[in-house]
């Protein structure tokens, strides 16, 4: 689910990050971005 994407992610500070995107899409969201080293999923 979405929270596990955030927990697992250690990404660059901002912008597109493939693993966030993939994880978020699996959780049913449209896309994922990186914000302050955490994945944020956009519904």
From Swiss-Prot:
The Swiss-Prot or TrEMBL note on domains reads: The presence of a 'disulfide through disulfide knot' structurally defines this protein as a knottin.
Task: Give me the disulphide-bonded residues.
Answer: 5-23, 11-34, 20-39, 24-41
Q: Does the keyword Transmembrane apply?
A: no
Q: Looking at the keywords, is Metal-binding present?
A: no
According to its UniProt entry, the function of this protein is described as: Reversibly blocks Kv11/ERG potassium channels.
The cross-references to SUPFAM superfamilies, in alphabetical order and at most eight, read: Scorpion toxin-like
Task: Return the Pfam families for the record.
Answer: Toxin_17
Protein's organism: Centruroides limpidus (Mexican scorpion)
Cellular localization per UniProt:
Secreted
Q: Can you supply one Gene Ontology CC term for this chain's record? A: extracellular region
Q: Which GO terms describe its molecular function?
A: potassium channel inhibitor activity; toxin activity
Official protein name in the record: Potassium channel toxin gamma-KTx 4.6
Similarity-based family: Belongs to the ergtoxin family. Gamma-KTx 4 subfamily.
> Tissue-wise, where is it found?
Expressed by the venom gland.
Keywords on record: Disulfide bond, Ion channel impairing toxin, Knottin, Neurotoxin, Potassium channel impairing toxin, Secreted, Toxin, Voltage-gated potassium channel impairing toxin
Domain of life from the UniProt record: Eukaryota
């Amino acid at each position: 689910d979405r929270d596990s994407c955030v927990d697992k992610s250690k990404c660059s500070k901002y912008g597109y990050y493939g693993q966030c995107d993939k994880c978020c899409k699996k959780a049913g969201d449209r896309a994922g971005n990186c914000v302050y080293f955490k994945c944020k999923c956009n519904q």
